[in-house]
Design a protein with these regions (language model features):
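Conserved glycine-rich beta-strand-loop-beta hairpin in the small C-terminal domain of fold type I
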Residues: 90-91, 129-132, 149-155, 174-178
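Active-site donor-binding acidic/aromatic loop of nucleotide-activated sugar
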Residues: 157-159
Length: 188
């Protein structure tokens, strides 16, 4: 679609700026301030219910802090109110449509079927609307589709790394390279 739009725009000599998709890594190093990292993850993952090409898609967390980071993230996400934006206290609204919600849930179900564990969320709620709860997955295997595809929903799959080289390798293991997030006290 992007190529077709660019070609059409070029034929008419139009300026073009496009956001064509992302699979943003959110890297948390062992020296990161976990409170700041969790707050950053909440913002980077849940802006517009995760339906943004710049949303953090894959939480890549050093193995020494992964359990604590995942627990804190799941605890914060579990406290969010999923409802219509017109309701008092609403934090997370619906996804754009039923197809999108089903796609998000299929990615979660695929990860779980391959061994991922759900810390919070992970199920389509009953009732009206295209709601999907904020979800944290841990022990996500590398062959899970959720690590390869843009999620476009409020789901945070957590994978671990042992060293910086491995973190970079995991972060770069996608064809989408729009944006990346990193939490560390040492940028060197």
């Amino acid at each position: 679609v992007g190529r077709a739009l660019i070609a059409d725009s070029a034929d008419r000599v139009l300026k073009v700026s496009m956001e064509l998709g992302g699979n943003a890594p959110f890297i948390v190093f062992e020296d990161a301030d976990l409170d700041k990292a969790v707050d950053g993850a909440m913002l980077a993952k849940l802006r517009n219910m995760g339906e943004a090409c710049t949303a953090a898609n894959r939480m890549i967390v050093h193995e020494s802090v992964a359990a604590e980071f995942s627990k804190r993230l799941a605890d914060k996400m579990a406290k969010l109110k999923v409802s219509r934006g017109t309701e008092d206290g609403a934090n997370i609204g619906p996804l754009i449509d039923d197809k999108s919600r089903n796609t998000v849930h299929a990615l979660v179900a695929d990860a779980v079927s391959k061994g991922a564990k759900v810390l919070t969320g992970g199920a389509i709620p009953t009732g009206e609307g295209y709601f999907y709860p904020p979800t944290v997955l841990v022990d996500v295997p590398v062959n899970a589709e959720i690590l390869k595809e843009e999620i476009f929903g409020p789901v945070a799959p957590v994978v671990t790394f042992k060293n910086e080289d491995e973190a970079v390798k995991i972060a770069n293991s996608t064809e989408y390279g729009l944006i990346a997030y990193a939490f560390t006290k040492d940028l060197n």
